[in-house]
Amino acid sequence: MPSNHLPTLYQEFIHLSRYSRWLPEKGRRETWGETIERYFGFFSEHLKEMHGYEIKKSLKDKLENAILECKIMPSMRCLMTAGEALKRENISGYNCSYVAVDRVQAFDEILYVLMNGTGVGFSVERQFVSKLPVVAEEFFPSDTVITVADSKLGWAKALKELVGMLYIGQVPKWDLGKIRPAGTPLKTFGGRASGPEPLNGLFNFCVNIFKKANGRKLSSIECHDIVCKIAEIVVVGGVRRSALISLSNLSDDRMRHAKSGQWWEHEGQRALANNSACYTEKPDMGVFMDEWKALYDSKSGERGIFNRASATEQAARNGRRNTEGHEYGTNPCSEIILRDREFCNLSEVVVRPEDTKETLLEKVELAAILGTFQSTLVNFKYVSKEWSKNCAEERLLGVSITGIMDNPLTNGKKGNLDSLLKELKERAIKSNATIAKEIGIPQSAAITCVKPSGTVSQLVDAASGIHARHNPYYIRTVRGDKKDPLTQMMVEAGFPVEDDIMNPGHTSVFSFPMKAPSHAVFRTDMSAIEQLELWLSYQKHWCEHKPSVTISVKEEEWMEVGSWVFDNFEWMSGVSFLPFSDHTYQQAPYQDCDVEAYKKMLSSMPKNVDWSVLASYETRDMTVGSQELACTAGGCEI
């Protein structure tokens, strides 16, 4: 029987700090094995109740063991919320969503989806925002008082009421007295309440924007800013867990320059979204060069490229998706092709250095089964019926591969990569079709992708998605709140620790020595063009959606990379470009070290750590809830 514990101290820390739920009856946090038991306990009951389907014991054992041994991973949203939270609201099991801002309801629906921990892609393209109504010419104070109930539904309904009144020129008062104080534990969903102040800030922000838009429709940048402000208020225990991508027209100058100059001084909410231009056809060279130069000048990879024509062609390629009448969008990491008002769940294959074609095929089969189980979550509260309709029709999966650079078969150094990827994709499709038929649901319309895999790769100790390892040896730093019992326990257990230089009074920084597998590829081993060629192989031969990647571009490579992107534009989407940096700073998440420094730190790590003693430090729920930033390249620390 596999161990109930994870193999390394770092992996144990990631589980306890990110995914472990508080067990009030036992007065402690879950073990790794108990987290997995909770996940399967939920799905066994859910599938039986909703579909009359019982998971065979032999299959359940195989799936449980594969997760215990970190061979595959389910949706980390499901892993976090399985139980009462997921039963109460199925949205909380999803990683990704997309919505066009073409209806007034889009704003409160986005708030509700984000509050469930799901990442949101949204579009403020003019063909959508032009459908919004005209704002009133004049504004008058109203006697109406919006009383906000202390729940996700309460917050969403209150925002809906406020926006509705602002459109007709009435400025109501609001009563936030029922909202729990900041820091109050959230029993069902986990984590801690953010208090009334963020919602008050959002309401005032909306009033100001609407007053400036009197007598006309909201502009794209105004809609963008409202959505960003909505995301900014969705915080739990100081952990931002909102992820956004904003799509705008290529010709939209205001959105192109949304992050130009000292934008953070006056428009801090814009930090919450990654921005991409939406291409509906291949641009001419002049337009492309202008946008490429703006991306280069930004030093932050913005605006990124979302190619809707490419996404539509990709969606149609497998013959299982009805693309007619759909203007596709994407999720914050840009690996899933989504209809307006649609969710996607993710699951993951973890590639190990010793994996063979046979073991990879088995992992793909099991990861597709998990995704198929998760695709039965179609009971959504509050949001419009289109969300449930789209999910029930398409049953999208996002079966991803992480650790690609750790194995010569998957990183292209050995064997025929294209042939292997085709075989793996066919196995995923077949696995889904078989299990979907047994459950009694439609086959999924699209199945395979590559996600950035930030927190998951940390949990399982693998290279992130299709990204290279940092270095053969490196030090990984992670932060802990000094009030958190886990931090206090680790300090006393003797983990290497120092005060956070930016916040010494409240935050500790722990260091973990890390060693990459011997056949791994490192970030200095590949040129930007080589990274793109590997990405293209996965796009053509593995993905029914898209592979998400962040390409590190050296200063002398920008012209060549721009040329490659233009030449391969029909495939482009899901790629971010950032300047390659050797620059490191104090307490950076990844720090290069040599073998001697690695061995020295390894010898200083505490031995035989008994994580169960954490229970003696914590007498009530101090978990901070869903720290996984639903899905965002910025949150993945790649």
Task: List PLM regions with ranges.
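Extended catalytic cores of very large enzyme megasubunits
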Residues: 1-638
